[in-house]
Amino acid sequence: MASLRDIKKRINATKKTSQITKAMEMVSASKLNRAEMNAKSFVPYMDKMQEVVANIALGAGNATHPMLVTRPVKKTGYLVITSDRGLAGAYNSNVLRTVYQTIQQRHQSPDEYAIIVIGRVGLSFFKKRNFPVILNITGLPDQPSFADIKEIANKAVGLFADGTFDELYMYYNHYVSAIQQEVTERKLLPLTDLVDNKQRTTYEFEPSQEEILDVLLPQYAESLIYGALLDAKASEHAARMTAMKNATDNAHELIRTLTLSYNRARQAAITQEITEIVAGANALQ
């Protein structure tokens, strides 16, 4: 049985830990509020941009753009969004497990796919397993701007355009609520979902539709990546807030259990002392 001193040390250590996890929970909650607003405020922009680009693409007649055309797949790209830090529950493990299983099912050789990864956790995961990581970015701020990911988004679109891979999938945690995040797979390139839109609005274009598509389609694809990153950041802060709340609750429960053990041990020690005193007094009579 642990001594009173040992139990007291564990109680004090657990109290300090609970203070840390509570502080981290509050910080994550504050970051979540802002990240959630950022993600939601970006949605109207994306919806309108998709509408405009879709109408231009549908109205282009016989003109086609490489980013809209499905071609034979020789190599697949995977853009995976993770975090730079842990302590976020299953936030990273869920998306990484999904990507890992998908790659194992779809591909027989590393030559058939390439990985673009955002976040230190994902980068470490794929490097340890010798997966072909061709691009990565780490150290993004908690509230990233488009400029923070402009370079890697531009390169990802460029790798599709130059034929390095023939399709690009994006994996990230979609924010549903503060207690629910869902791993999401989205086919980023080619942009086949645009031409599936049957609604059209008539526009007059200057310069030509083809020239406008050359500019807008890469920007649209880059914006999809940024939108997913904002969504993933909200999910990250929510997952970390929940994980820290659970850790704090567990710490409080452990403190209650240890305090009960401490009181019982203390009571047993006092009872033992009284018994010894009574026994000694009886021996003197």
Swiss-Prot record:
The keyword RNA-binding does not apply. Keywords: ATP synthesis, Cell membrane, CF(1), Hydrogen ion transport, Ion transport, Membrane, Transport. GO terms for cellular component: plasma membrane; proton-transporting ATP synthase complex. CDD domains: F1-ATPase_gamma (cd12151). Gene3D superfamilies: 3.40.1380.10, ATP synthase, gamma subunit, helix hairpin domain (1.10.287.80). InterPro entries: ATP_synth_F1_ATPase_gsu, ATP_synth_F1_gsu, ATP_synth_F1_gsu_CS. GO terms for molecular function: ATP binding; proton-transporting ATP synthase activity, rotational mechanism. It is a peripheral membrane protein. Its main location: membrane. One of its GO terms (biological process) is proton motive force-driven plasma membrane ATP synthesis. The keyword Ion transport applies. It is found in: Cell membrane. Belongs to the ATPase gamma chain family. Produces ATP from ADP in the presence of a proton gradient across the membrane. The gamma chain is believed to be important in regulating ATPase activity and the flow of protons through the CF(0) complex. F-type ATPases have 2 components, CF(1) - the catalytic core - and CF(0) - the membrane proton channel. CF(1) has five subunits: alpha(3), beta(3), gamma(1), delta(1), epsilon(1). CF(0) has three main subunits: a, b and c. HAMAP family: ATP_synth_gamma_bact. This is ATP synthase gamma chain. It comes from Geobacillus sp. (strain WCH70). The lineage of its organism: Bacteria, Bacillati, Bacillota, Bacilli, Bacillales. The gene is atpG.
